[in-house]
Amino acid sequence: MAVTSSSSTCDGFFIISLIVIVSSLFGTSSAQLNATFYSGTCPNASAIVRSTIQQALQSDARIGGSLIRLHFHDCFVNGCDGSLLLDDTSSIQSEKNAPANANSTRGFNVVDSIKTALENACPGIVSCSDILALASEASVSLAGGPSWTVLLGRRDGLTANLSGANSSLPSPFEGLNNITSKFVAVGLKTTDVVSLSGAHTFGRGQCVTFNNRLFNFNGTGNPDPTLNSTLLSSLQQLCPQNGSNTGITNLDLSTPDAFDNNYFTNLQSNNGLLQSDQELFSNTGSATVPIVNSFASNQTLFFEAFVQSMIKMGNISPLTGSSGEIRQDCKVVNGQSSATEAGDIQLQSDGPVSVADM
């Protein structure tokens, strides 16, 4: 991965103000999260997470997008409680089996490596749900994006919610209205839809996530008319009709491994890879269009909005206090063993918007 040094555009005043504002928006449970939660019990937690991801990036350039996607998929189902990380057991149906996650989510091995390192340094202290939040921030800043103060203190859930994963996660094939409704259902707004979609500024997508646009869009017998003709030709070569759909390409064509605002300038030239990406700009009259234009012309504005949206998303229904537990192994509830051996799954797309209807 072409990692650049992080050049945060959010000054200290902005971050401090943002933490105060967001904490006040999400009630008592979220207000219990704070930036210094581990200062006395595991002061090097953030550094350990960052170091482990730096090592992972040496062999896997797309791991940053994958880790953010895990955090997104976790928070949208049952709140940010680490439930996505749980394997099948005799009493738990894993969220990994949902169409939006199966053959799609990846990076579990890196989460396990982070957990092992943290357990070695400070046993039984840092939750798996906090690992996902810290890993997301580290992934963004290591790719040249903004850095922010992560609010901590989440505890891990005791069960998974497969039916919730089946119904709550957005799909790259969905229309903008449906996707926005799913964001609103967890307390997010239109600006959050656009800013969090901006995480597609790095990562990869597999043919199956966008081949619906290449030959027979919405049953018309023609390609998606909002897809740039030059991009269309190259994608048709990568993903031929009736092919295996296993080809992989960059979500951001211009700077695929850097966290920047080029994702939005790509949308302005009809170079969004996924249907759900391009609809943010091509859906005439949508409230998302001026937001895309603003982020395309002002990277600082995008970075600030992205930080705010990540903090808001990380505050979705966390378990705090004595609720839940601190898992010893992110794959299983304490005292249980998994029914399946956890492992990485073949990537289909990185970033917040999920793969559904596989």
From Swiss-Prot:
Glycosylation sites: 34, 44, 103, 161, 166, 178, 218, 228, 242, 298
Swiss-Prot/TrEMBL site (Transition state stabilizer) positions: 69
Family matches, as SUPFAM superfamilies: Heme-dependent peroxidases
GO molecular function, one term: heme binding
Protein name: Peroxidase 54
Keywords: Calcium, Disulfide bond, Glycoprotein, Heme, Hydrogen peroxide, Iron, Metal-binding, Oxidoreductase, Peroxidase, Pyrrolidone carboxylic acid, Secreted, Signal, Vacuole
EC class name: oxidoreductase
Positions of Ca(2+) 2 binding: 201, 252, 255, 260
